[in-house]
C-alpha cells in the first residue's frame, strides 16, 4: 500500500510506529512562545519517520539523494521550495530528522502537514501569508 494513503495525520503516523499519540514532549517549563514549535517539531519527526518506512539517510554516502522542505518569506508572503543535495550542498555528519527518501514524500508532507510546518517555523504566522500563493 502507498504510504501516503496510510499516513494522513499525526495519529496515523503514531499508529504505524506503535507510538501513543498522547505522549507528547513535556513543555510546561518552557517559555510559552516556544511550546508550540517544540511539539510541532516532534510531530513532524514522527510523521516523517513513518513516511520514510524505516529508511534513514546515510550521511556518509554522498551519492544518496536526501530531500528536505525549504520555506522562505518574500514580499508576496510565504513560499515553498524543494531541494536536494544536487541543487544545494551542506556538509554534516549529523542528519536532519526532517529528511525524506524521495521528493514525492517531501511534497506530500509539505502539502498535507503545512500547518505543522508553520507552527514549527514561526512564532507567529506572518500576516502576509496567503494560503493560495503556494509555489
Over which residues does each language-model region extend?
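Short, compact, well-ordered microdomains
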Residues: 85-126
Amino acid at each position: 500500500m502507498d504510504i501516503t494513503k496510510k499516513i494522513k495525520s499525526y495519529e496515523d503516523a503514531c499508529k504505524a510506529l506503535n507510538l501513543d499519540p498522547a505522549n507528547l514532549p513535556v513543555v510546561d517549563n518552557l517559555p510559552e512562545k516556544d511550546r508550540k514549535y517544540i511539539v510541532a517539531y516532534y510531530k513532524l519527526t514522527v510523521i516523517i519517520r513513518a513516511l520514510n518506512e524505516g529508511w534513514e539517510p546515510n550521511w556518509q554516502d554522498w551519492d544518496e539523494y536526501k530531500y528536505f522542505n525549504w520555506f522562505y518569506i518574500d514580499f508576496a508572503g510565504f513560499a515553498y521550495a524543494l531541494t536536494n543535495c544536487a541543487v544545494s550542498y551542506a556538509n554534516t555528519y549529523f542528519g536532519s530528522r526532517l529528511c525524506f527518501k524521495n521528493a514525492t514524500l517531501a511534497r506530500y508532507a509539505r502539502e498535507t502537514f503545512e500547518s505543522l510546518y508553520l507552527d514549527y517555523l514561526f512564532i507567529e504566522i506572518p500576516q502576509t501569508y496567503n494560503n493560495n500563493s503556494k509555489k
